[in-house]
Amino acid sequence: MTVIVYSKPACQYCVKAKDLLERLGYEYTEKVITKDISLEEFFKELGKPVRTVPQIVIAGEHIGSYNELTEYFADKGKINYKGEII
């Protein structure tokens, strides 16, 4: 399963998202905006402009930010709504 994390340096929620993915056993590719990918390429890959990072894509599905990532895994029964692994 392909997981992409679009991030920026010194982003607290980017660190949290990557930590959650690692704790759940997911491997991911990180694309740091303005280092690995331009802002224009970032918007093009997502298909729409967004204002926050991280932005996570799992198996081609745009999940969204850290909060949406926790909701995604909570809905799948992998974590509770506090972000704790079940």
What are these regions (language model features)?
Residues 1-29:
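Local sequence-structure signature of Cys/Sec-based thiol-disulfide redox active-site neighborhoods
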Residues 15, 40, 67, 71:
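Alpha-helical elements of the RecA-like P-loop NTPase motor core of helicases
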Residues 32-50:
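Thioredoxin-like thiol-disulfide oxidoreductase module
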Residues 8, 33, 60:
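Conserved residues at beta->alpha junctions
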Residues 58-86:
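Non-catalytic, surface beta->alpha helical segment in thiol-disulfide oxidoreductase systems
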Residues 12, 37, 64:
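Short alpha-helical
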